Amino acid sequence: MSNPGDVRPVPHRSKVCRCLFGPVDSEQLRRDCDALMAGCLQEARERWNFDFVTETPLEGNFVWERVRSLGLPKVYLSPGSRSRDDLGGDKRPSTSSALLQGPAPEDHVALSLSCTLVSERPEDSPGGPGTSQGRKRRQTSLTDFYHSKRRLVFCKRKP
């Protein structure tokens, strides 16, 4: 054990973070990352018969076909892919005017009505019937998700 009188003050250093391996060569790091990305893209290209750089299908074991995104919610559509589909990009069939108009307004109204009906039902609320939405949720326990079961242990009776 050390004595309290043996305590030496630690010299104050301005930097806590130390460069242990020398300065970073950003050009070499970029080349390494580009080489790794090119290797991953080549492996994916051979595996899936699809060129992910140009986004074109290749000949091979898989047959790729275009799926229109009319049935998908807008959350799943990236802004770039939606504009390319609408504009009819390279090697893609042009879209008709009916497809560019989007969903019919009556479909949108029916969807919003069904959503409001679901949210107004109190028995579907997380706190159960009769609880207000403003309250905090209680802490969940393991038995909320799994039913507790008694384990049967068979043993011989003592005579």
From Swiss-Prot:
Listed GO MF terms: cyclin binding; cyclin-dependent protein kinase activating kinase activity; cyclin-dependent protein serine/threonine kinase inhibitor activity; protein sequestering activity; protein serine/threonine kinase binding; protein-containing complex binding; ubiquitin protein ligase binding; zinc ion binding
Q: Where is this region: Interaction with TRIM39?
A: 147-159
Residues with the Phosphoserine modification: S78, S112, S125, S141
What PTMs does it carry? Answer: Phosphorylation of Thr-140 or Ser-141 impairs binding to PCNA. Phosphorylation at Ser-112 by GSK3-beta enhances ubiquitination by the DCX(DTL) complex. Phosphorylation of Thr-140 by PIM2 enhances its stability and inhibits cell proliferation. Phosphorylation of Thr-140 by PIM1 results in the relocation of CDKN1A to the cytoplasm and enhanced CDKN1A protein stability. UV radiation-induced phosphorylation at Ser-78 and Ser-141 by NUAK1 leads to its degradation.
N-acetylserine is found on S2
Q: Where is this region: Required for binding cyclins?
A: 17-24
Record's keyword terms, sorted: Acetylation, Cell cycle, Cytoplasm, Metal-binding, Nucleus, Phosphoprotein, Protein kinase inhibitor, Ubl conjugation, Zinc, Zinc-finger
In its keyword annotation, does this UniProt entry include Iron?
Answer: no
Residue ranges covered by zinc fingers (C4-type): 12-40
InterPro entries documented for this protein: CDI_dom, CDI_dom_sf, CDKN1A
Q: Where is this region: Disordered?
A: 78-106, 118-142
Query: Where in this protein would one find the motif PIP-box K+4 motif, according to its record?
Result: 135-159
Q: Which domain of life is it from?
A: Eukaryota
Q: Identify residues that carry Phosphothreonine.
A: T140
* GO process terms (BP): cellular response to amino acid starvation; cellular response to cell-matrix adhesion; cellular response to gamma radiation; cellular response to UV-B; cellular senescence; DNA damage response; DNA damage response, signal transduction by p53 class mediator; epidermis development
Residue location of crosslink Glycyl serine ester (Ser-Gly) (interchain with G-Cter in ubiquitin): S2
Annotated tissue distribution: Expressed in keratinocytes (at protein level).
Q: Where is the composition biased (Basic and acidic residues)?
A: 82-93
Give a GO cellular-component term. Answer: nucleoplasm
The induction annotation reads: By p53, mezerein (antileukemic compound) and interferon beta.
Q: Where found, per UniProt?
A: Cytoplasm; Nucleus
Q: Record's family?
A: Belongs to the CDI family.
Its subunit composition reads: Interacts with HDAC1; the interaction is prevented by competitive binding of C10orf90/FATS to HDAC1 facilitating acetylation and protein stabilization of CDKN1A/p21. Interacts with MKRN1. Interacts with PSMA3. Interacts with PCNA. Component of the ternary complex, cyclin D-CDK4-CDKN1A. Interacts (via its N-terminal domain) with CDK4; the interaction promotes the assembly of the cyclin D-CDK4 complex, its nuclear translocation and promotes the cyclin D-dependent enzyme activity of CDK4.
**Entry function:** May be involved in p53/TP53 mediated inhibition of cellular proliferation in response to DNA damage. Binds to and inhibits cyclin-dependent kinase activity, preventing phosphorylation of critical cyclin-dependent kinase substrates and blocking cell cycle progression. Functions in the nuclear localization and assembly of cyclin D-CDK4 complex and promotes its kinase activity towards RB1. At higher stoichiometric ratios, inhibits the kinase activity of the cyclin D-CDK4 complex. Inhibits DNA synthesis by DNA polymerase delta by competing with POLD3 for PCNA binding. Plays an important role in controlling cell cycle progression and DNA damage-induced G2 arrest. Involved in p53/TP53 mediated inhibition of cellular proliferation in response to DNA damage. Also involved in p53-independent DNA damage-induced G2 arrest mediated by CREB3L1 in astrocytes and osteoblasts. Binds to and inhibits cyclin-dependent kinase activity, preventing phosphorylation of critical cyclin-dependent kinase substrates and blocking cell cycle progression. Functions in the nuclear localization and assembly of cyclin D-CDK4 complex and promotes its kinase activity towards RB1.
Q: Tell what the record comments on domains.
A: The C-terminal is required for nuclear localization of the cyclin D-CDK4 complex.
What is this protein's record name? Cyclin-dependent kinase inhibitor 1
